[in-house]
Curated annotation (Swiss-Prot):
This is Serine hydroxymethyltransferase. NCBIfam families: PRK00011.1 (NF000586). It catalyses: (6R)-5,10-methylene-5,6,7,8-tetrahydrofolate + glycine + H2O = (6S)-5,6,7,8-tetrahydrofolate + L-serine. InterPro entries: PyrdxlP-dep_Trfase, PyrdxlP-dep_Trfase_major, PyrdxlP-dep_Trfase_small, Ser_HO-MeTrfase, Ser_HO-MeTrfase-like, Ser_HO-MeTrfase_PLP_BS, SHMT-like_dom. One of its GO terms (biological process) is glycine biosynthetic process from serine. It is found in: Cytoplasm. The keyword Nucleus does not apply. Pathway: One-carbon metabolism; tetrahydrofolate interconversion; Amino-acid biosynthesis; glycine biosynthesis; glycine from L-serine: step 1/1.
Length: 417
C-alpha cells in the first residue's frame, strides 16, 4: 500500500538535495532567459496529481482504454479554454512539447523532401523551422528567409523566395526576434503560391492571449505554441486552427495520435487547463502589458550605455544584444553575468563571426522578472547592473558587487512568497 506521507527527502537525500538547490537557485538568481518563466502553484498541483497514473490513448469520448470518464472532462476543459483564449475552433492539447506539436503539423501537411520556407536560425528562427541539425532540416528542403539591415523581417525577400522556390509551406514565428510580425502579409505571400501558412507562436502566446501582440490564428492555416514561456503554464505544446476545415483537423489529430505520440500526459494537460484559465483573468493582461514595458525599459538603458540592440528595440518580451563591437563573446557574457546571479543565454546575432557554441550575442527576456513583480524601475536598474558587469567583464570585484545587489532585490521580490 502506498502511504501519502511518503516523500523524497526521507527516501532519496541526494535527489532531494539537488531539487532544493534548484529552488534556492531560482529564488536567488534573476532569470532573463526569454523562454523561461515561473508557473503557478496551481499548475504544479495539477502536475503532481494522481492524473499522472492514467493512460488515455485517443481523444475525449474516443479512448482506447476504459476508465477515462474524468480525464475526458479534464482534456475537454483544456481544449475549450484554448479555443476560447485564442479565437480558434480547433485545439489539440496533447503535444508533449512545442517541438512535438511542430512534428505533428509537418507530418500532417508535408511529405519528406517538400520545400519549406522558414526563418533563418541565425536571424531569429528556431531549430524546428529548418535547422540542418534538426529533423526539420533533414526531412525537408529548407529555404531560409531573414531580416534586413534594419533588423526587421524582409517580406520583399520572402515573397521573392516564395515565388522562386514555390514552397509547400511558409513558417512564421521565431525564437529570437523582437519585432511585430505581419501575419496578414505572410498569409498573402503563402496564398500567392498556394502554400500552407503555419505559425509557431511559442514565444509570444501569452502576449497574444492578452492582446499585447497580434494573434496569428485568424491568418494561419495552423498555429502551434508551447504552454510555458510567456503563457506561464506547464512545459508542453498546443495546436490551434480555425476556419472549419474538418479534414485538416482530422489530419492534425491523427498526426499527434497515433502517428507521433502514444498516451497523453493527463497531469500536464490538467496543468494546461489551469494555465489557460489563469490566462483569461484580468491580472494576466496586466502582467503581459508589464512584460512588454519592462523589456522596453531594459533596452533603453542598454542603448544609453552604448550597447547595440538588434533591430534597435523591442515590441515584445525579448531582445538581442549584439556584442561584436564590444569584442565580447556571448559565451563570456553569459558566464560573467551568471557569476553575478543573472541568468541569460548566449545567442547568435545576424552575420555572427563566432560559432553557435560561442556566439557574439545574448538573448534577454522579461517574462520571469515581471512574474516576480519587477516594474520599469527595477528593470532599468537591472539593465544598468548588467552593463556594469559587461563593461568590466574580467573584474571579479564588480561582479561580486552586482551579485550582492541581485541577492538583495531577489529577497525583495521572491518568486513564490
Amino acid at each position: 500500500m502506498l502511504k501519502r506521507e511518503m516523500n523524497i527527502a526521507d527516501y532519496d537525500a541526494d535527489l532531494w538535495r539537488a531539487m532544493e538547490q534548484e529552488v534556492v537557485r531560482q529564488e536567488e538568481h534573476i532569470e532573463l532567459i526569454a523562454s523561461e518563466n515561473y508557473t503557478s502553484p496551481r499548475v504544479m498541483q495539477a502536475q503532481g496529481s494522481q492524473l499522472t497514473n492514467k493512460y488515455a490513448e485517443g481523444y475525449p469520448g474516443k479512448r482506447y482504454y476504459g476508465g477515462c470518464e474524468y480525464v475526458d472532462i479534464v482534456e475537454q476543459l483544456a481544449i475549450d479554454r484554448a479555443k476560447e483564449l485564442f479565437g480558434a475552433d480547433y485545439a489539440n492539447v496533447q503535444p508533449h512539447s512545442g517541438s512535438q506539436a511542430n512534428v505533428a503539423v509537418y507530418s500532417a501537411l508535408l511529405q519528406p523532401g517538400d520545400t519549406v520556407l522558414g526563418m533563418n536560425l541565425a536571424h531569429g528562427g528556431h531549430l524546428t523551422h529548418g535547422s540542418p541539425v534538426n529533423f526539420s532540416g533533414k526531412l525537408y528542403n529548407i529555404v531560409p528567409y531573414g531580416i534586413d539591415e534594419s533588423g526587421k523581417i524582409d517580406y520583399e525577400d520572402m515573397a521573392s523566395q516564395a515565388e522562386r522556390y514555390k514552397p509547400k509551406m511558409i513558417i512564421g514565428g521565431f525564437s529570437a526576434y523582437s519585432g511585430i510580425v505581419d501575419w496578414a502579409k505572410m498569409r498573402e505571400i503563402a496564398d500567392s503560391i498556394g502554400a500552407y501558412f503555419f505559425v509557431d507562436m511559442a514565444h509570444v502566446a501569452g502576449l497574444v492571449a492578452a492582446g499585447v501582440y497580434p494573434n496569428p490564428v485568424p491568418h494561419a492555416h495552423v498555429v502551434t505554441t508551447t504552454t510555458h514561456k510567456t503563457l506561464a503554464g506547464p512545459r508542453g505544446g498546443l495546436i490551434l486552427a480555425r476556419g472549419g476545415d474538418e479534414e485538416l483537423y482530422k489530419k492534425l489529430n491523427s498526426s499527434v495520435f497515433p502517428a507521433n505520440q502514444g498516451g497523453p500526459l493527463m497531469h500536464v494537460i490538467a496543468g494546461k487547463a489551469v494555465a489557460l484559465k489563469e490566462a483569461m483573468e484580468p491580472e494576466f493582461k496586466v502582467y503581459q502589458q508589464q512584460v512588454a514595458k519592462n523589456a522596453k525599459a531594459m533596452v533603453a538603458v542598454f542603448l544609453e550605455r552604448g550597447y547595440k540592440v538588434v533591430s534597435g528595440g523591442t515590441d515584445n518580451h525579448l531582445f538581442l544584444l549584439d556584442l561584436v563591437d564590444k569584442n565580447i563573446t556571448g559565451k563570456d557574457a553569459d558566464a560573467a553575468l551568471g557569476r553575478a546571479n543573472i541568468t541569460v543565454n548566449k545567442n547568435s546575432v545576424p552575420n555572427d563571426p563566432k560559432s553557435p557554441f560561442v556566439t557574439s550575442g545574448v538573448r534577454i527576456g522579461s517574462p520571469a522578472i515581471t512574474r516576480r513583480g519587477f516594474k520599469e524601475e527595477e528593470s532599468r536598474e537591472l539593465a544598468g547592473w548588467m552593463c556594469d558587469v559587461l563593461d568590466n567583464i574580467t573584474d571579479e570585484a564588480t561582479i561580486e558587487r552586482i551579485k550582492q545587489k541581485v541577492l538583495a532585490i531577489c529577497a525583495r521580490f521572491p518568486v513564490y512568497a
